[in-house]
Amino acid sequence: NNDKKLVELFLNSKIGKKCFSFSELNINETLPLIKNCDLYIGNDTGWLHISSALGLRCLGLFMDSPVMAYGKYSKNISIIIPEGETEESTTHDTLGKDKISYEKVFNKASELLN
């Protein structure tokens, strides 16, 4: 699917050589790995909040959830919202998956890692 293509594109980028995907791992395999990461990148799910609680810098993609409810409680979370939205306008029905560009995520991730 399209998400796998985006993950592959990111993993093959200049910062991707230090990255890996959790897509095939279960929670027991994932937690020790998360704790040793420098940055979490992903949509607003439990993984974002677990990563933040473990003290990681996080880049949360708020494509279909309200930033004001889930993205502002931790200094560890940087946010990206869909094009044309504001932090206040994102909701559970934003349907913004196709309105967040790879370049925007890549550039913000690079900034957070440097």
Please annotate each region the language model reported.
Residues 3-5, 67-68, 86:
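Flexible, glycine-rich phosphate/dinucleotide-binding loops
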Residues 1-63:
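Donor-binding and catalytic core of enzymes assembling or modifying cell-surface/extracellular glycoconjugates
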Residues 15, 60, 70, 87-90:
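Homeobox/homeodomain signature
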Residues 54-82:
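Gly/Pro- and small hydrophobic-enriched strand-loop and loop-to-helix capping segments
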Residues 74-114:
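Leloir-type glycosyltransferase catalytic cores
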